[in-house]
Amino acid sequence: MKKLLFSAVSLDIGGIENALVNLLNYLARTDKYEITLFLEKKEGIFLDKIDKKIQICVYCPNDSKVIILRKGINFIKQTMFKMKYKNKYDFSCAYATYSKPASFVARTASKNSCLWVHSEYMQMFDNNKSKYVEFFEG
């Protein structure tokens, strides 16, 4: 059985979230995959629509206003995540590409990772290619 990981911010209302739930439930019905969904916030109207076979985990970065505290805590969280999950999955996908934590989770969990692009990112970064590249390279 192949192990798949998907990461997102939450399952709040929206097109990306609805598409993710539909994809996960479709994959779960095939019984070919062990699926894990990492969320930054375990909340949203689609949460109860997720198939019971899908494991839901939380990876929530610290957002303290005290920069040194935030960076220290997040460094520890990232290190612990890497120790536990680095390359443990056959495939991983950051389904919320606007989220650096979701991207980190997917890039760490598998050598075969992808970023689901559901937006026009060059517009988000005012057509500044260096900002665009910096965002996606982490």
Regions found by a protein language model. Give the residues of each.
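Membrane-interface segments of envelope glycosyltransferases acting on lipid-linked substrates or membrane lipids
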Residues: 1-138
